């Protein structure tokens, strides 16, 4: 197992070292607008369309670009409550953690699920339609059935910055 993680770490470090200025420029532009036409992208990064197409494909094939998404305003689609949920498991066995992670992937309200260190085991970000739907989520998911000992809800009062980009 240690050898596998060492290889993965080496490959990630190697990929980051092999990102040249053009790759970083392409990634910065795509993080602002993943739907930008190749012609426009090539103009912004001062390269040919063919080169940009090859670079984007290479960045995708290597796992640096994992997916292209549209960022949707939760309020605009009726999700008026945003909540960070700190979850403590009653059993840290990997089987139960994986079961919990599978359940989180199935839940539409859950936007992010992070395994974390410290007093809690997981941190969730979810967008709920209203308090009633959030309460239903907690009754359905944050239960002993999924080995949740306790959870803490932190309701978002205001989004000052919600950006998923990594400036390179």
UniProtKB/Swiss-Prot annotation:
Superkingdom, natural source: Bacteria
GO cellular component: cytosol
InterPro entries linked: AsnC-type_HTH_dom, Dimeric_a/b-barrel, Tscrpt_reg_AsnC-like, Tscrpt_reg_AsnC/Lrp_C, Tscrpt_reg_HTH_AsnC-type_CS, WH-like_DNA-bd_sf, WH_DNA-bd_sf
Keywords, sorted A to Z: DNA-binding, Transcription, Transcription regulation
Disulfide bond residue pairs: none
Occurrences of domain HTH asnC-type (ranges): 19-80
One GO MF term: sequence-specific DNA binding
GO biological process, one term: response to amino acid
A Pfam family per the record: HTH_24
DNA-binding region boundaries: 38-57
PROSITE patterns attached to this UniProt entry: HTH_ASNC_1, HTH_ASNC_2
Protein name: Uncharacterized HTH-type transcriptional regulator HI_0224
Species: Haemophilus influenzae (strain ATCC 51907 / DSM 11121 / KW20 / Rd)
